[in-house]
């Protein structure tokens, strides 16, 4: 079990290192395109951290079974479960999203929510940066974040603190790792909670990877289209 605690620590260390690299590049006053490209490529390398248990000697089969990177009922069925679970959770998500946004506007007296870093990056005119962002959102995030937050963290906490605390706790860390503004943190946390429930339902992260990938694909594509039209 200690290998999975180490995995979480190694992942966050890698994630923090990428952030520090970004600050260092800003201090060095490199061009925005170079800054974004280097940081995004470095974030791709963080994907290697999910293999920490394997690097420490755990058999691949055992690692995959622990984190849920398998489909004992069949891959097609798990993909279908991911799509159905995502669609069902979106009904809850949209209701809560509307409530959160309404409360925000009341509290902040109609001030619009702060734009996120991802919005700024997606506004880049550099094709390489856009490709890196799109692949990070639609490939890296479903694989790495689901393996870490639902496959490792949720799984580790589930047997120790129960379903509710494990789902909420892993969703909270998932949201905070994104570093968004408060409103966006709540919405990302709600996604994380839904993914945790899908993980509990299926005993696999394949459906959560599908749900995560579909969500990020739709959102990122929509943002690219909107920013392209507004540009």
State each model region's role.
Residues 1-68, 72, 76, 217-231:
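N-terminal, membrane-interfacial amphipathic/helix-forming hydrophobic leader that caps
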Residues 16, 83, 87, 98-108:
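Hydrophobic alpha-helical membrane segments
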Residues 18-23, 61, 97, 101, ...:
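Short helix-terminus and kink motifs of transmembrane alpha helices
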Residues 32-36, 47-48, 81, 85, ...:
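Short alpha-helical transmembrane interface motifs in multi-pass membrane proteins
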Residues 60-63, 103-117:
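Peri-membrane helix termini and adjoining interfacial loops of integral membrane proteins
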Residues 74-95:
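Interfacial segments of alpha-helical transmembrane regions
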Residues 89-98, 109-231:
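Transmembrane helix-loop-helix hairpins at the membrane interface
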